[in-house]
Design a protein with these regions (language model features):
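Positively charged n-region of N-terminal signal peptides that target proteins for export
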Residues: 1-4, 20
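C-terminal motif of bacterial Sec signal peptides marking the signal peptidase cleavage site
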Residues: 14-17
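Sec-dependent signal peptide hydrophobic core
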Residues: 5-9
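Buried hydrophobic residues that stabilize the cores of well-folded domains
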Residues: 21-270
Length: 270
């Protein structure tokens, strides 16, 4: 199953020097930063999710401006998405998995996304899909619900938190069939790559790390279990397990029990 990963930039280190003579040299403006994350292959060399490189570019204010995802084997561009910022608003344009993407996002006074209207058009067939995502937050600034509206149908996801950790999400279909529950157990690794926003966000979960989707969990999950219900009876369960290594307070690697592994390369970020 394809996993949508998000990557959090670490705090930049500010170096100061002292001198008896006053230095009137102006402080240089920060420059845009790029960081790349490489997704590896399983131990047997069989590609699971594709040999993919993810590159994230940020502006001088450390805001995400571009996501570039490309397969290394054949140089196929999976995603190339651009972000433009204005007061209380983000515009998104680009391509994602064979679709032209446009989206308009509304932010509240805390910089959290409250609504996204998204349109995707197939580059081969012209098929068009229009969706609206509505987001709510609890008193602690954590995501409480997301509602996806498409062709008049609504699908709501509810998030359950305990002690600052996301423990489960519940997806209510509004019918007797297809309700889903995602449940998580936590690890000791810091939350720098997230799984819980997959398919809830219009393919731009990376904005989570700018605070656009509220407060992050404290730690990464050690397990992620998906259970599908029909008429209240569980009919399918799939569990993924994750093992991490951390270097200098940052994620270095993530190994999944299904065989896929990820290596993280970090740029100097705010």
């Amino acid at each position: 199953m394809k996993k949508l990963l998000l990557f959090l930039a670490a705090a930049a280190v500010i170096f100061a020097s002292c001198s008896k003579k006053k230095d009137n040299t102006p402080t240089p403006e920060p420059t845009p930063v790029t960081k790349t994350v490489l997704a590896g292959m399983d131990a047997s060399g069989i590609t699971l999710y594709g040999d993919v490189a993810y590159t994230y570019t940020y502006d001088a204010d450390y805001r995400l401006t571009n996501i570039y995802e490309v397969t290394l084997s054949d140089n196929y561009v999976v995603r190339d998405i651009n972000f433009t910022y204005s007061d209380g608003h983000i515009s998104i344009t680009g391509i994602t998995e064979g679709y032209d993407l446009t989206a308009e996002c509304t932010l509240d006074e805390q910089g959290r996304m409250t609504e996204m209207t998204r349109s995707v058009v197939s580059t081969t067939t012209g098929f068009t899909s229009n969706r609206t995502f509505i987001y709510t937050y609890d008193a602690d600034g954590r995501m409480a619900t997301t509602t996806q509206i498409s062709e008049g149908d609504e699908l709501t996801h509810t998030f359950v938190w305990e002690n600052g950790e996301l423990v489960s999400t519940y997806t209510g279909t509004g019918t007797a069939n297809g309700d889903m529950v995602l449940s998580f157990e936590t690890s000791d690794a810091p939350a720098q790559a997230l799984f819980y926003l997959m398919k809830y966000d219009g393919d731009v979960s990376e904005l989570c790390h700018q605070g656009c989707f509220g407060t992050l969990p404290v730690h990464m999950p050690s397990t992620r279990s998906l259970t599908v219900y029909m008429n209240g009876i569980p009919i399918h369960t799939n569990t993924s397990e994750y093992v991490y290594t951390v270097e200098n307070g940052r994620l270095a690697t993530c190994q999944e029990n299904e065989g896929s592994s990820f290596t993280f390369h970090w740029g100097m970020m705010k």
